[in-house]
Curated annotation (Swiss-Prot):
Residue positions, PTM Symmetric dimethylarginine: R627, R629
Compartment(s) where it occurs, according to its Swiss-Prot or TrEMBL record: Cytoplasm; Cleavage furrow
Keyword Transit peptide recorded: no
Amino acid composition bias (Basic residues), ranges on this chain: 596-609
Segments of skewed composition (Acidic residues): 225-240
Cellular component terms (Gene Ontology): cleavage furrow; cytoplasm
Position of sequence motif RG Motif 2: 629-630
Positions with biased composition (Basic and acidic residues): 178-187
Residue numbers covered by motif RG Motif 1: 627-628
Name assigned to this protein: Bucky ball
Species assigned in the record: Danio rerio (Zebrafish)
Length: 639
């Protein structure tokens, strides 16, 4: 028993125990620790029981002040994770009250200290406000220090200052500063020459002045001071030594400002020989820069930064008239010089035609632009195979620029646009032009002849349906020989009722003018040129496919239609000027070579859906006349 007691003593929870002799086994009973939660990863601090926050989010922290809470009745499955001892994360010493959920509100916000503040109760200024106040005070001190001379033009606020006043004020100041500094020893010059130190904050205000006063700011003042000295060389030729000293000091300033941007005082070049070399370089540079009024305005604004001893520097700022939106008079880089400002100006075609403040438009004007949202361009038309009749009214697809007029699409091309009222007269006057098949090279005229006689038979009833027939025949030949176009099959009703022509007149304007024009040419050519066998077979197959799409017909109606088409074709070839018989006549020989082939093709396909005799003859003609090229539904009732 003694060994057992001794062995059981280290079995505690880790608290130090002195070895004590016990007569019986014992256990140290301690409050249970925080449970190990197996679902670890969604641990939203504002979700209950470790569940994902969006599911149960009521603004309460995840870990309750007491660590022994009742688990919910359901558990959300999570990825397998290693258990974590949360006692090391959130140590907690449970109390008696923590075991009861009714008193959980006593421990809900324990240990949470938050400080909130809004802008209405903040009395102390923030750090940014303090920094701003300090900067303003430092600027005021700099202004007071520069009030000793009459050349105080530094302002803590960006004011728009006139260029003439700045020019007059800084000519004297630059002369005095330059002569004074060049007369000093080269050794003491780096330490005493603190007037050329760049000042960031006052130059920022000066930068705003440049923007407001339509002046192009630069990052160095040596260019403008050399331009000043170029003017002074003309006026003060009796003082060559003074001018040389000024150029020497200015070149030192330019050399030092481009090399030193870290200290408030600019290090100048101490070797006088280098000063003379820079003087020669400055003379050469002066000749390259043309004097202009813009330069005279720009000079004093940048040279102001050297007149006052401020602990700041002007760095290279990417600010010019192009980016600030002001008129671009001249853009000068202090290290690169151009003979004329034409190298910096954009070309004339980029200039904005509006005359606004911007120097040029970032986007050049497009040569051909969309005139309307509803008007497709030629590129869009060429990308498609065809514009359907349900999309655009009266369109003639010829290369050219599309113009919009009267709500329709017109075309600025050599071929005139003809309305649908002019088409019957155009059929008689169109010039004969050779049209060949793109596949076989044969002419495409024979099939149009079967509907040519329509304009001599009934000008009010048959002319409209025949014109639609010409549309369809020409579209079929083109669809089978040139490109895969979607076109309507023959809509000429062989048993036309008096209202059939009226329906055709309603929907005839849905055709494209392109097809109407080409069908006019094809009709005239039908008298001269025969048609190739390749195109005949293509037309037969195409009509068979289209009849499948539009709806199956019974056999007698199809045979009757083809018989009438053959008879009409023969009469049209025999006597073109005579008035042929009406379309209603059914009988006629079938001696055309292509007719048996086409009949057999249609006969083998269109026997799928038989109808009554009345519906066959009556509904067929209405269906053909009422359907548009891209439509599959009836457009009106039969009665």
């Amino acid at each position: 028993m003694e060994g057992i007691n001794n062995n059981s003593q280290p079995m505690g929870v880790g608290q130090p125990h002195h070895p004590v002799n016990h007569t019986r086994p014992f256990f140290y009973v301690q409050p249970p620790s925080q449970p190990y939660f197996m679902y670890q990863w969604p641990m939203n601090p504002y979700g209950h029981y470790g569940f994902p926050g969006p599911a149960l989010h009521f603004g309460r922290p995840y870990m309750a002040p007491y660590q022994f809470m009742q688990y919910p009745g359901y558990v959300i499955p999570h990825a397998p994770m290693q258990p974590i001892d949360y006692r090391r994360i959130n140590p907690h010493y449970p109390s008696v009250a923590s075991y009861d959920l009714r008193v959980r509100h006593h421990f809900q916000n324990a240990g949470m200290h938050r400080e909130t503040a809004c802008s209405e109760v903040q009395t102390d200024p923030s750090d940014s406000v303090n920094k701003l106040i300090d900067k303003i005070e430092s600027l005021k001190a700099c202004e007071l220090g520069s009030d000793k001379g009459p050349n105080n033009v530094v302002s803590s606020t960006p004011d728009v200052v006139q260029g003439e006043k700045l020019t007059r004020l800084n000519e004297d100041s630059n002369l005095e500063v330059a002569t004074k500094e060049c007369k000093e020893d080269p050794v003491t010059r780096p330490t005493t020459y603190s007037d050329s130190a760049y000042d960031a904050e006052s130059s920022q205000g000066r930068l705003d002045e440049c923007v407001f006063s339509d002046v192009l700011p630069l990052d160095s003042s040596s260019v403008h001071e050399e331009e000043e000295e170029e003017e002074k060389d003309v006026n003060e030729e009796d003082e060559p030594q003074t001018v040389a000293d000024e150029i020497c000091s200015q070149n030192e300033m330019s050399a030092s400002t481009t090399s030193n941007v870290f200290c408030s005082g600019v290090q100048s070049i101490a070797d006088p020989t280098e000063c003379h070399d820079l003087e020669k370089l400055g003379d050469e540079q002066k000749q390259d820069i043309p004097s202009a009024d813009a330069a005279a305005v720009i000079e004093p604004l940048i040279s102001l930064s050297e007149d006052f001893d401020l602990p700041y520097q002007i760095l290279r700022l990417p600010c010019n008239k192009t980016t600030t939106g002001l008129s671009l008079e001249r853009e000068i880089d202090p290290l690169v010089y151009f003979d004329s400002p034409s190298t910096l100006l954009p070309p004339q075609n980029y200039l904005s035609s509006i005359g606004s403040a911007y120097s040029y438009s970032y986007y050049p004007q497009v040569t051909q632009e969309r005139q309307s949202v509803l008007s497709p361009s030629i590129d869009e038309l060429s990308s498609r195979d065809e514009m359907f009749s349900t999309d655009v009214e009266d369109l003639e697809v010829v290369p050219g620029h599309v113009y919009v007029g009267g709500g329709r699409l017109a075309e600025a091309s050599d071929m005139p646009v003809r309305s649908r009222k002019e088409l019957p007269s155009v059929d008689k006057t169109c010039s004969v032009c050779q049209k060949t098949c793109a596949c076989c090279g044969s002419t495409l005229q024979d099939e149009v002849g079967m509907c040519k006689m329509a304009e001599h038979s009934h000008p009010e009833r048959d002319e409209m349906s025949d014109q639609d027939c010409d549309y369809d025949l020409e579209a079929e030949v083109r669809s089978n020989c040139e490109s895969p176009r979607v076109s309507k099959r023959k809509c000429c009703s062989r048993h036309a009722l008096p209202s059939c022509g009226h329906h055709c007149a309603k929907h005839r304007h849905r055709k494209l003018l392109c097809e109407g024009q080409e069908s006019c040419d094809l009709r005239e050519q039908a008298r001269v040129h025969p048609k190739g066998e390749c195109c005949e077979e293509y037309g037969a197959l195409a009509k068979a496919d289209k009849r499948i799409q539009k709806g199956a017909l019974c056999r007698p109606c199809i045979e009757q239609q083809w018989r009438e088409g053959v008879v009409s074709d023969q009469e049209n070839w025999a006597s073109c000027g005579a008035k042929p018989r009406s379309w209603r006549q059914v009988t006629g020989p079938q001696d055309q070579g292509r007719t048996p082939l086409r009949r057999s093709t249609c006969k083998s396909i269109h026997q799928q859906r038989p109808r009554s005799e009345y519906n066959d003859y009556d509904e067929t003609e209405f269906t053909y006349c009422q359907r548009g090229r891209g439509s599959m539904k009836k457009r009106g009732s039969r009665y």
